[in-house]
Amino acid sequence: MRKIFYSVAGLLTLSGGVSITAQQAVVDTTNVYELNEVVVSAVQARRETPVAFRNVSAAELRENNTGQSLPYLFTQTPSVVVTSDGGNGVGYVSMRVRGTDAGRINFTVDGVPVNDSESHGVFWVNMPDFASSVESIQIQRGAGTSTNGAAAFGATVAMQTQRPRLEPYFEASSAAGSYGTFAHTVRGGTGLIGNHFVFDARYSNVQTDGYIERARANMSSYYASAAYYNGGTMIKFQTFGSSEVSYQAWNGVDSARLRTNRRYNSCGEYTDENGVKKFYDNQTDNYWQHHYHLLATQRLTDGLNLNVTLHYTDGRGYYEDYKARAKYAVYKLPNYTGADGKAQKRTDLVRRKWLQNDFYGALARLTYTRDRLQAVWGASINNYAGDHFGRVMWMKTVEAMPRPDYEYYRSRGEKLDYNTFLKASYRLSNALSAYADLQYRGINYSITGTDDKAGAIDVHRTFSFFNPKAGLSYERGGNHAYASFAVAHREPNRKNFTENGPSAQPTYETLYDYEAGYEYTGRAFHLGANLYYMDYDNQLVLTGKISEIGEPLTSNIKDSYRMGVELSGGVRLAPWLDWSGHVTLSSNKIRGFTEYVDTYDKDWNVLPQTVNELGTTDIAFSPNLTFGSTFDFHWRGFTAALMSSYVGRQYLDNTSARERSIDPYFLSDLRVGYAFHPHFMKEIALDVSVRNLFNAEYESGGWTYSSIQDGRRSTSSGYFAQATRNFMARLTLKF
């Protein structure tokens, strides 16, 4: 074990002051780092684990972190596609892996689930600049290893918060760029105090006007931790959270306007009494979220470690919007009779839709390493309680409003999620290892109250899942080959229940995942190939069918799959130049897909839906080809990187209709920087990024809706246009 002798004392405050009290200390840094690794060892894969994964280091995160949301730092990971509502990667963003949406990707921070328990999604607008407090991120593709929480149904993103830094430090970073984008971060730590204590803290603020009109965002976040180390003991408390206000840009841009004003934003649009088109200024999303983790790790014996984590998250917020010509009936109000004696069915109003929730639980992990065996036992229990309610804040017909802040719906969702797993890797020989992973997961979910669309809701469902995984791994010299089979299950989310109506309740989905791969690592190059076949049973998809309450119905389809090959590699072209890249070729299909289209007569009277049997079709938002390439130059403090990516055609629905699709696009980003180390501080670094270097006009997401009126089909589609060439410059000071 490496030991470091040093003199330290003092608290480095965020104002930059340092007070020093010298004392000799002997610190086993390897021991400190190993205790931190125990926290994530239960959910992160090791090299010999037979799954496809990529590790993103802290250095890579810091190098590319210039204010965009975290998924934009994954763009050079195989099979990852990202999109942004505002167009410039700040605020509301989302990611897909192998075409799998975020509601099917499991996200954890130090093993604690991050996915929303009800929607299964992750809202990165609530985690601005979280990359500045992350030590490493592992992105597993496919079913992956057993983890905690919902949505482990196609990919896993396991994040580890920053390791303790044993010497005092202070860093400040400011970035400014196109579309009024500013990102500021200060972070610091005490180093080791009294040979036992470490304190770290960060504060960040990110602001932007957005590429899309009015897609402004103002987001602040913080991270703070206090850790205690003593021999084989680690106790750490950490808290992180954020507040955000962002103007809505959820509607996208219709296809006609893409050619004339691709930055147009229809959110908040209304027409006043004089017939003048205006935009409601407070058409915003507002949210506050705070996470609290208490982690304890104890080395019980040589090779045996126990970790226990308690966690609590509270969140609250609302989005406010202007509703023109809203029906009184939707807001549980009678029609209004005006002074002229005529009944009015509609009015203009402003509403707020609220969510207040609490999420808390406990996790335990026991890791054992001895000779040929590595084993992990884990268990967790998590409880969620969330109140959904809506209020009318203003109404044009003031007399029709029953009371201020009139509440027109309220429901409560409660979810108990518990699991236990045992996974082990056993070395059968010097080169061959066997892997097994068994998980049981149980869910109790209820929704009661009233909904803004469905009226009364009364859902009570329980699920019990058994998720086995097994595989073999062979490693000799620089060669590594593996094969695995895994089963995963996913319960329906809140929307699947509330918008399907009482007589069309969905059931769970099942994934059978087959993976096989090969990697070679040499002195100057590495390459890898991974084959996958993901076979779905009862996958939930939109078919166009309308539920009995008039909402789009998500239906369980019996037969669908994703299969493909992922290639990756890298080479050192010169001592100062590296290249790395990846390619994914895939086929993503639904067998026997049936489309349902809303149908009307010439006078817009509702007719039965038109049914189209389309046979085998492509799964929406699943490009058949993606690739990425990075040239990385580094010489005497100078750095430069040229990063390129290509995303093939993505269909907006499951019909494989080219007219309802997103065109393929190719992007390149350039980053150049210089860092030097003056005698009075650790480092001064300046870098400049040019995003979308070749000024491509492209869209990365969207939606579509079709109807038939008097025998003619028409389609409305919205596309999320992304920023053309734009710039970002950053200055970083390290003390």
Task: Name each region found by the language model.
Residues 176-207, 212-249, 287, 292-302, ...:
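Transmembrane beta-barrel wall of Gram-negative outer-membrane proteins
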Residues 71-113, 135:
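Extracytoplasmic beta-strand/coil segments of soluble accessory domains associated
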Residues 430, 533-535, 555-654:
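Gram-negative outer-membrane beta-barrel transporters
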Residues 287-452, 473-477, 481-484, 525-531, ...:
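Face-selective signature of the C-terminal outer-membrane beta-barrel domain
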Residues 305-311, 473-486, 507-563, 568-572, ...:
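Membrane-embedded beta-barrel scaffold of Gram-negative outer-membrane proteins
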